[in-house]
Amino acid sequence: MYEYFLGQVTDVTPGYVVIEVSGIGYKVLTANPYRYQVGPTAVKMYIHQAVSENGMSLFGFFDADEKALFEKLLGVSGIGPKSALAILANNDHAGLIQAINQENATYLTSFPGVGKKTAQQIVLDLKGKLNDLNVDVTGQTALDVDAPAVDGALADALAALEALGYSKADVKKVTKKLETFSQTQGADTNTLLSEGLRLLMKK
């Protein structure tokens, strides 16, 4: 089993990144691919290896605590790797832990693939068991909102636009419109990225 990879990111896509280690390129699924940038600088990516009847998949994480949170979610009945990854894509891990501790089912059921029964199971299995994880809040907390914050998704979309070759100045010109769009639509990273591309192509 892998603990982490240390290598260069050679490709970034909406669903995964490719990291090259000792001349071998690994396809790694990650919640927020645009957190990474293609370049010669070596990055450390924590890895969870999942084996199923469909083959082997690698899931990547920014640090050990994010990986630990993912693996805790996997221990909940009804949560598979892709569902756990979708939950982490919100980018507000402290808000997630707070929601679990407060039994905030409305917050939890807003994630893809999480129904009321699964939300209750998450609370039952994980309440009070995640407080030792060192995670940061990148958006609003569960106290402030009944649905996941869009701040993390917006940041990822803006980073993605720059990764696609748009200048910081061009991206800055559409940031305000994307902020408004995200607040009214509650959009995820891919939706915000598509809207950003549409706005930039109009210029």
UniProtKB/Swiss-Prot annotation:
Compartments in which it is found: Cytoplasm
A Pfam family the protein falls into: RuvA_N
Domain comment, as recorded: Has three domains with a flexible linker between the domains II and III and assumes an 'L' shape. Domain III is highly mobile and contacts RuvB.
GO annotation, biological process: DNA recombination; DNA repair
Chain intervals for the UniProt region annotation (Domain III): 149-203
Record GO terms (molecular function): ATP binding; four-way junction DNA binding; four-way junction helicase activity
Region spans: Domain II: 63-141
Keyword NADP: no
Family the entry assigns: Belongs to the RuvA family.
Region (Flexible linker), start-end ranges: 142-148
Chief localisation class: cytoplasm
Subunit annotation: Homotetramer. Forms an RuvA(8)-RuvB(12)-Holliday junction (HJ) complex. HJ DNA is sandwiched between 2 RuvA tetramers; dsDNA enters through RuvA and exits via RuvB. An RuvB hexamer assembles on each DNA strand where it exits the tetramer. Each RuvB hexamer is contacted by two RuvA subunits (via domain III) on 2 adjacent RuvB subunits; this complex drives branch migration. In the full resolvosome a probable DNA-RuvA(4)-RuvB(12)-RuvC(2) complex forms which resolves the HJ.
A GO cellular component entry from the record: cytoplasm
Protein name: Holliday junction branch migration complex subunit RuvA
Region (Domain I), start-end ranges: 1-62
Protein role: The RuvA-RuvB-RuvC complex processes Holliday junction (HJ) DNA during genetic recombination and DNA repair, while the RuvA-RuvB complex plays an important role in the rescue of blocked DNA replication forks via replication fork reversal (RFR). RuvA specifically binds to HJ cruciform DNA, conferring on it an open structure. The RuvB hexamer acts as an ATP-dependent pump, pulling dsDNA into and through the RuvAB complex. HJ branch migration allows RuvC to scan DNA until it finds its consensus sequence, where it cleaves and resolves the cruciform DNA.
Species: Lactiplantibacillus plantarum (strain ATCC BAA-793 / NCIMB 8826 / WCFS1) (Lactobacillus plantarum)
Keywords: Cytoplasm, DNA damage, DNA recombination, DNA repair, DNA-binding
